[in-house]
Structures are given as structure tokens and as C-alpha cells.
């Protein structure tokens, strides 16, 4: 089994494969270690924004309890390394290596993999574990190549320039483009150390309270064996109850009434966030600019206690571009509304290329079919995992898979399913396993039926939740039938494998 990528997807699926007796597992990873996004993102203040007891995978198996309610980046990265050690994943791993092509050989019924280092590898099963936050998105801004100061992307933080504790920034004027999840964690640290910080905002993020604390020894000791599995079971059970209540309400209210209730709930949440801004930010104009004006889930909600107070510091300046974004950069810094803001360091907090099919590089399946060509008119999968014509290949991430705020929950059920598929093939001595075109068609229709052309997507500010505003890409999104329903679909498929898959066997 060969994994393209060495983040959470590869680590937790490898653990399940080891449990099922798979010995030959190779990870090919661009970075110099496992961890994926937690290897690359080392910026000051980096931490998970989902409760760590749910977010970190394999806590039961690792007999580990996170030290904080929201674990910080170094702890998460160390946890990734510990998983790789426990399951002997370093032995065959290849680091600082990028897969350049993955091509199916119909005669040998194996995948031929090449890399940027000139390697040629062969694998029976390939798992695309590239991750949804794998490729930095550097905004295309006119003149950015003319900038004479220092610059970098948040996921490639240059501590050689800033110093380990940002001590080198005491006489440095810093500009940061973007106010998404990474910027929200970074800006408070810059505010404490830099001579000045200019924050260039396209769209304000919604900032809610972050209830963070250290894990007490007493609480950790009381959890017992299997505590994380029990937590996840309770979460899924709660989601089922919520779905059932929505279903009951749906039968008793009109569509207009349903929309009205959703809008009222959204207004209540946003009013609370707006009030927190007014209560925290001293300058009325700055406070007004920091208020999100869209529906709550248009953009990923953020949780932080120091972001808003940072704008009360005299060295922090908000440049509100009113949705336009920075469109020009000069030799001295970003230019907006005719003003060039002179900065010594320019940080791009512009996120990642999410839901982009080209992230897979070159993958060629049966009958010389290129995956990008197949996806050219829209993604086609079953469960977001299998795609017809690409036998023994599995995809992990978000394309046509269930939407789940805690991505690790999704990766866990996908990893379990992939391990079960591989075990099924090995048990029956199948050479290949591939999804049927009929099952793929069924799932594409499921995705479209549950996604719909929603008012929310039309009204949302551009972002990765709505493909930067490209509403015509409906089938490229998530399955919005609910996470419990997604789990049930997987269970139904595994109970009737022969209906959904075709096999070959010598």
C-alpha cells in the first residue's frame, strides 16, 4: 500500500491497515517528516480550532490525552510522529519527495509511481492522502514580484528572519494580507512584538470565544480505556438526534418558515459576535470593519480570545478593503485606494487551494484515463473515496464526502472503510477492486440532491466553502445529507460489496 501524503489521513488509515495485517506500507511525503499540515504550519500561535480530545486521532490506541482543550501545533506534530513510530511507518517512508505521476498498468495490475527525485515505485493499492490544506494559495496580485522587502506564506514561516520568539521584529514594520483562520492566530503574536502591523482585510472573520484550558490530571485519569471512541459515539448519536428533529420539523412547517427560523438563528449568532466586537474593540470605525456581514457558515468560524484586543494596540492598523482585497503591491508594500503602505515584511495569510482537482498531479487509470480529464466536467466518485476506472485507488479528503466541522471524524470513517475494502480484496484474493459506474452515478446524484443551489451559497462572500463563488460546481462540493447518513451509506455499501464493486482475479 502506498500513500501519497503523510498527514492524518495516512497515519490513521495506516494504523487500521496494520491492525488488519498489512505489512508493506509506504508513505511518500513532500515534507521532511509526517504530519501534513502540522508539519508545514509552524507559525506563531498555531493550534487546532476543534477540541483536541476529538480532533487528534488515535488517542485510545496511543494511550494519550492532549495537554490542552485546544492543543497547540507542536503537540499535534509530536503526536503525529508518535503514531508513525508506534506503527512502524518510518521504515519505508520517503520524505522530501513529491509524487509526479501515478499510472495504472493493466498487465501487471499495479500502480507505477514516479517522483521528482527520479524514483520509480510499484504498488498494488494507492491512497491519495494529499490533504485539503496541502497546497499554499498565494494570491495573484499585480506587482507582487516588485516588492523589495522580505515576504513569505504563513505555512512557510521564516523563523530565520523573525526569530524563534519574533524577537527580531521589534524594529520591523509588518504587513499581513488575509484575516482567515491562520491570520487570526498569528496577528496577536505580531502585535506584541512588531514595530507596527498593517492588517489587510478582504472579508472579516467571525470571531467567537475560545474556551481553552489545560487538561487536569484528575480529568485525564477518569477517562479510562476507549474514552475517545465513546466521545465520538456520543457526538454521532447527538447528530442523529438533531437530524431526526429536523426531519420531524420539516414535515410540520413550510419551506418559508424553515428558512425564517434558520435566518433568525443566524442573526442571533451574528448579533452575539457583533456585540463582542463592540465590547472589545475601542475604536468604533475599526469595530465596524471587523464585523462579519454574511451568514455564519459562509466562512469557517474562528475562535480566539486575543485577536480582537490586538486591534486596541497603537501599533496595529486595520486596512479594510471592503471586500475588494489587495489588488496591487509596489516596491515598498501593498497599495490600496491609492495609498502604498510601506512595510519591511509582508506575510501572505491567503490560505490553501481547497477543493482543487489538480492537486493530485498526474494520475492515469485504466484505459489511459487521466483523473483530471475525468473530473474536468465535475468530480465523479462514490463516497468521495472511489472513482470508476481507477482500480485499487482510494481518495481521502473532502471531495463529495460528508461535510464535518471536525475533519478527523470524516478521515476516521474513510480510513476504516478503505482498510475494510483492502482486507476484503486480500481475503478473497482479488487482484483489483473498483467501483461500478452505476454506484458512482448514484452518489453524484446524492451529492447534487443534498447540496442544491442554496440561497446561502449565492449570498456568501467568496471562500473555499463555496468555491470562491463558483455556484455551477455543485457536484464538486461535499455531501450535505449529514454525517450520520454518510456513515450509514458506508455501512450499507460494506454489507453489499458485490453490488457496488467489480473485481478481477487470476
PLM region descriptions:
Residues 67-133:
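Feature captures the FAD/FMN-dependent oxidoreductase FAD-binding
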Residues 412, 416-506:
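C-terminal active-site-capping segments
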Residues 3, 8-90, 202, 279-281, ...:
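Beta1-alpha1 glycine-rich phosphate/pyrophosphate-binding loop at the start
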Residues 138-151, 332-384:
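Central helical "cap/lid" subdomain
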Residues 63-82, 94, 261-263, 295-306:
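Short beta-strand to alpha-helix junction loop
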Residues 2-34, 129-272, 341, 379, ...:
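Rossmann-like dinucleotide-binding core of oxidoreductases
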Residues 120-133, 175-177, 334, 342-353:
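Short hydrophobic core segments
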Residues 95-110, 316-333:
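A conserved short coil-to-beta-strand element within the FAD-binding core of flavoproteins
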